[in-house]
C-alpha cells in the first residue's frame, strides 16, 4: 500500500482490528520511509449477479433499487427501518447464496413478496399489484383471498 504522505510503496501493518460487526478490518499502518502512521479499512467486495429484466436486458444488481421498491410498498406503513433492512439483507443473502452469475428479476420479485408478506400485508398487496401487473379489482381480491388462506393454514 502506498503511503498517503510521501507516496512510498513500502508500509507495514502495526495493528489490525475487526470493526462493523466483523464486516470490516481496520488496520494501522506505518510508512517505512517517512514513519508516518495512517489508518485503512478493508471490506470484502461481494459480486452480485446480473439481473435479467422482463424485456431481456441485463443490469447489475443495485441494492438501492431493491430498497426503493420496498420503501414504496411500505410507505406510511408501521414497519421499522430496522425490519426493512433485515428483509433487504435476507433477500441479498439469498441471492448471493444461490451463487449464480445471472438471476431473473422475477426471482428477486418473489423474494421481495415473501419478505413483504412477513412484514406487512398491505405492503405485500401494493407490491404485488405492480409486480404482477394487476388489471382490475378482481386481481386484488384474488391476492387478498390467497393471503387469507395462507394465514388460515398457518393458524
Swiss-Prot record:
One of its GO terms (molecular function) is zinc ion binding. A zinc finger (unnamed) spans 3-34. Keywords: ATP-binding, DNA-binding, Metal-binding, Nucleotide-binding, Repressor, Transcription, Transcription regulation, Zinc, Zinc-finger. It comes from Legionella pneumophila (strain Lens). Binds 1 zinc ion. Its cofactor is Zn(2+). PANTHER family: TRANSCRIPTIONAL REPRESSOR NRDR (PTHR30455:SF2). InterPro entries: ATP-cone_dom (IPR005144), NrdR-like_N (IPR055173), RNR_NrdR-like (IPR003796). PROSITE patterns: ATP_CONE (PS51161). Belongs to the NrdR family. Residues 49-139 form the ATP-cone domain. Negatively regulates transcription of bacterial ribonucleotide reductase nrd genes and operons by binding to NrdR-boxes. GO terms for biological process: negative regulation of DNA-templated transcription. This is Transcriptional repressor NrdR.
